[in-house]
Amino acid sequence: MKAASKSGVKLCLKLLALAVKVDRDPSLGFLAYLTTFTNDRESEIRKNVDLIQTFKMANPVIGVVHLLPLPSSARWQGDFQAVIARAEQEATALASGGAHGLIVENFFDAPFPKSQVDPAVVSAMSIIVQRLKHLVTIPIGINVLRNDARSALAIATCTRVSFIRVNVLTGVMATDQGVIEGKAHELMRYRRELGSDVKVLADVLVKHASPLGSPNLTTAVEDTIHRGLADGIILSGWATGRPPNLEELELARAAAGDTPVFVGSGANWDNVGELMRHADGAIVSSSLKRKGKIEEPIDPVRVRQFVTALAQGVANRDSAASGNGAVSYPTVAV
């Protein structure tokens, strides 16, 4: 069933649940129920429209293509064709396994510069992204580590792909590359200068880093969205392969409002159903690789298992919210 059809079915179920409640207690004003329901529904629609426009579905699985070391990095091996071949293999595995999008990331370039990367990295990633565009049809995003959002936006705009990931868009984080300051004002002005419609997915309190000062997750989420102008937010665990805390994910979901929330690390087919109770999508890599090992290539069978598990988690979440006593409405008479 298509996403739009599923959405219509859920809408009908919720309206039916409303009618049953009012029939049982006529003193509860139906218009009050309907007004509250409509506001919630409009919020859900706005969020889903943004995701569907980008990923062609409301709860996407976004796999990550970890590029082998690129030219100028400390572990560069001198064979760019091997880098391209591995990237093509992993993109194909993601697409054939049913992923709804992918991020191209210079993961194996560590140790990273904290801001601007070498021009050779920008050139190499541009070539690879262009190759992948002609190989797969799923949306492509870019993350230039550790935090070269400007280069990521330039590559994405010139290659005409859909989105970028930014590790530090707002705030100040202490990282193994040093202190990194978010530069949302520079990035968003640059996006305007380029006339770009590339979406910006931004980490909040990113992994492998600690915020300077007293961290407040709710404030960080709100600042990233309303002051940093992020199109979506990402919540990760403390490191690659570690899931976010469920309570923190719930707080982030509440603070984000209409803005999509993605799980940014640690999701696997055992925990993704629980994580999706408070998220709109998942960015995943480690658990998709052979034997779950970060250095191994992506396995399309593991991709399919993950996509199936996430879809089941979303179905369970939506079923629980569709009227079986899980949805409550204010008792305000009109």
Which stretches of residues belong to each language-model region?
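Hydrophobic faces of well-ordered beta-strands that scaffold small-molecule active sites
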Residues: 61-65, 104, 140-144, 166, ...
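Glycine-rich, proline-tolerant flexible connector loops at the mouths of alpha/beta enzymes
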Residues: 101-124, 171-175, 234-243, 292
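N-terminal small/glycine-rich loop or linker at the start of catalytic domains
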Residues: 52-79, 193-209
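C-terminal helical cap(s) of enzyme catalytic domains, especially alpha/beta-barrels
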Residues: 179-183, 290-318
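Glycine-rich phosphate-binding active-site loops on the catalytic face of alpha/beta enzymes
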Residues: 162-177, 234-239, 265, 279-299
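Conserved anion-binding
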Residues: 157-230
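Alpha-helix-loop-beta-strand connector modules within alpha/beta enzyme cores
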Residues: 115-141, 184-200, 244-263, 303-313
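Catalytic cores of alpha/beta
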Residues: 147-159, 267-281
